[in-house]
């Protein structure tokens, strides 16, 4: 298990964060991203996932993450 930090960004400002989330691998981050995205109502927000080293491994717009989380939206 590795620890990952989840952050919601509005511009360059972090408006919400959930640090040190244990995940078995980076693919396990997507359900968490979808859950966070469903709660975001501000336009233009992004969700960033960082490794404990500080390296960004996922950066996605909240709207895109919401669409990804909706199984009725075809790719």
Protein language model annotation of sequence segments:
Residues 25-41:
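A short, charged, amphipathic alpha-helix used as a generic interaction element across diverse proteins
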Residues 39-75:
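Short, mixed-charge low-complexity intrinsically disordered segments
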Residues 17-26:
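Short, contiguous acidic and Ser/Thr-rich linear segments
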Residues 6, 29, 47-49:
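Generic recognition of well-ordered secondary-structure surfaces with a strong bias
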Residues 1-17:
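Short aromatic-glycine-(Arg/Gly/Cys) micro-motifs in beta-strand/loop hairpins
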């Amino acid at each position: 298990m590795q620890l990952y930090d989840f952050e919601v960004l509005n511009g360059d400002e972090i408006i919400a964060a959930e640090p040190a989330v244990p995940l078995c691998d980076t693919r396990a981050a997507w359900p968490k991203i979808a859950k966070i995205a469903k709660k975001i109502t501000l336009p233009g927000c992004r969700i960033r996932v960082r490794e404990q080293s500080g390296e960004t491994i996922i950066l996605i717009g909240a709207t895109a993450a919401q669409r990804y989380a909706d199984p009725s939206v075809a790719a």
